[in-house]
């Protein structure tokens, strides 16, 4: 039976510790639905837990008209550092036999759905260990006050990372990610109709996000995509990401297309979608179950 708990009183992040985990999945969900992930992705989480994965779920604050994705990503990154540090501290005191497993970065990977995929991409950029290269990418794609605001947010996140650097390592980069119906273009679903108000809505907007991905040539080397043939929301973004990711230095590049629509990962037949993950690296994505 899956049971989520809070590891920090002032953090919305929920964790389900599996008694015998073979991996640790970190999850960020879709626009609106990502603010109540335990209910919206109930079937997905039960499936993954049954497959022997511990889960770390990062809920999004319910702010339907907040398109400042940089600020949200920065808050997620700071919370991520704090949660990871607390997991290590807690296990040291209460379950030292499990400490090595949860302290090993190779046991962690990311799973995102829809807008949650954009946050995972931003998190990898924000946590880049080469600050000079990261800043060069930001200067190439952002201007004026936007760049100033991002630099301020990054300094705040970097300060939090320095506090816990002895306990954790670079755990965004080099952790495999699987993106389900990735959506980076600020599309909103109203009465089952996908609406993309403006290519310049949001921060970073569609143009800026694409620029950041295109210029981050050292990143995104461990990413797989799953898309759906009836998805009218993420189709353009999937095409863009597939084109970009094929240029990265993959050992295996995965893009699987399934029957279904954009919100298929929230359905009750999630076992038809669930990835069969292998024990190490991007090889985890070499097999995916078919419908």
Give the ranges of each region predicted by the language model.
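Flexible, membrane-associating and regulatory peripheral segments of lipid-active enzymes
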Residues: 1-27, 76, 85, 96-99, ...
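Short, surface-exposed "cap/lid" segments of acyl-processing enzymes
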Residues: 6-63
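Hydrophobic/aromatic beta-strand patches that form the interior of the parallel beta-sheet core
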Residues: 26, 56, 109, 176-178, ...
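Short, highly selective alpha-helical patches that border small-molecule cofactor pockets
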Residues: 41, 120, 238-239
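Catalytic nucleophile-loop/oxyanion-hole region of alpha/beta-hydrolase
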Residues: 58-92
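Short beta-alpha junction loops
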Residues: 59-65, 182-184, 229-230
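Serine-dependent carboxylesterase/thioesterase catalytic core
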Residues: 77-78, 85-87, 93-217
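C-terminal catalytic-base region of ester-bond hydrolases, centering on the histidine
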Residues: 184, 189-291
């Amino acid at each position: 039976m899956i049971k989520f708990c809070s590891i920090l009183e002032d953090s919305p992040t929920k964790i389900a510790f599996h008694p015998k985990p073979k991996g640790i999945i970190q999850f960020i969900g879709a626009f609106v639905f990502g603010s109540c992930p335990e209910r919206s992705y109930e079937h997905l989480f039960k499936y993954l837990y049954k497959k022997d994965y511990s889960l770390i779920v990062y809920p999004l604050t319910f702010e339907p008209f907040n398109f400042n994705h940089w600020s949200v990503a920065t808050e997620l990154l700071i919370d991520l550092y704090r949660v990871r540090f607390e997991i290590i501290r807690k296990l040291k005191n209460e379950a030292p036999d499990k400490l090595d497993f949860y302290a090993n970065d190779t046991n962690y990977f990311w799973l995102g759905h829809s807008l949650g995929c954009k946050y995972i991409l931003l998190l990898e950029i924000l946590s880049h260990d080469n600050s000079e290269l990261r800043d060069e990418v930001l200067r190439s794609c952002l201007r004026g006050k936007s760049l100033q605001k991002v630099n301020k947010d990054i300094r705040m996140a970097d300060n939090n990372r320095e506090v816990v650097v002895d306990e954790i390592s670079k755990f965004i980069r080099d952790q495999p990610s699987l993106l389900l119906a990735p959506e980076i273009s600020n599309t909103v679903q109203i009465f089952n109709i996908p609406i993309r108000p403006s290519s310049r809505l949001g921060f970073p907007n569609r143009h800026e996000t694409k620029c950041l991905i295109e210029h981050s040539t050292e990143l995104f080397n461990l990413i797989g995509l799953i898309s759906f043939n009836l998805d009218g929301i993420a189709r353009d973004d999937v095409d863009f990401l597939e084109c970009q990711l094929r240029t990265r230095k993959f050992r295996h590049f995965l893009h699987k297309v399934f029957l279904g629509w954009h919100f298929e990962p929230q359905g009750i037949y999630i076992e038809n979608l669930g990835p069969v993950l292998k024990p190490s690296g991007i090889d985890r994505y070499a097999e995916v179950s078919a419908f």
